[in-house]
Amino acid sequence: MPKKNEAPASFEKALSELEQIVTRLESGDLPLEEALNEFERGVQLARQGQAKLQQAEQRVQILLSDNEDASLTPFTPDNE
């Protein structure tokens, strides 16, 4: 497992670690200090993931801007 302040090697690993943190926090079995540390790490991973998604979106926009026939449609996620 990476050190607490290190970014995971990939978006997928960060997402997996974030899911594990959520599971541990939802269990309610963690002592307060450990729960706070896990929450802090989760926020950090969420921010890193968001940044990676934004970078990917920018790359897609750059690639599509080279193709005049392609148009961008804003993504609207379904409400779950």
UniProtKB/Swiss-Prot annotation:
Its UniProt entry gives the catalysed reaction(s) as: Exonucleolytic cleavage in either 5'- to 3'- or 3'- to 5'-direction to yield nucleoside 5'-phosphates
The Gene Ontology CC terms held by the record are:
cytosol; exodeoxyribonuclease VII complex
- Can you cite a GO biological process for this protein? DNA catabolic process
EC main class here is hydrolase
Enzyme Commission no: 3.1.11.6
Where does the record place it? Cytoplasm
Pfam families, per this entry? Exonuc_VII_S (PF02609)
* Listed GO MF terms: exodeoxyribonuclease VII activity
State what the entry records as the consequence of deleting this gene: No longer processes msDNA correctly (when retron Ec78 or Ec83 are expressed in the strain).
Cofactor stoichiometry and binding? Does not require a metal cofactor.
Principal place of residence: cytoplasm
Alphabetized UniProt keyword annotations = Cytoplasm, Exonuclease, Hydrolase, Nuclease
Tell me about pH and activity. Answer: Optimum pH is 7.8 to 7.9.
Instruction: Give TM segment ranges.
Output: none
Question: HAMAP family, per this entry?
Answer: Exonuc_7_S
Q: Quaternary structure per UniProt?
A: Heterooligomer composed of two different subunits with an approximate ratio of 4:1 for small to large subunit. Also estimated to have a 6:1 ration for small to large subunits.
Protein family membership: Belongs to the XseB family.
PANTHER family reported for this sequence: EXODEOXYRIBONUCLEASE 7 SMALL SUBUNIT
Q: Could you tell me what this protein does?
A: Bidirectionally degrades single-stranded DNA into large acid-insoluble oligonucleotides, which are then degraded further into small acid-soluble oligonucleotides. It can degrade 3' or 5' ss regions extending from the termini of duplex DNA molecules and displaced ss regions. It can also excise thymine dimers in vitro. Required for production of the mature 5'-end of retron Ec78 or Ec83 msDNA. When in excess of the large subunit, counteracts the large subunit's toxicity.
State what protein this is by name.
Exodeoxyribonuclease 7 small subunit
Organism, scientific name = Escherichia coli (strain K12)
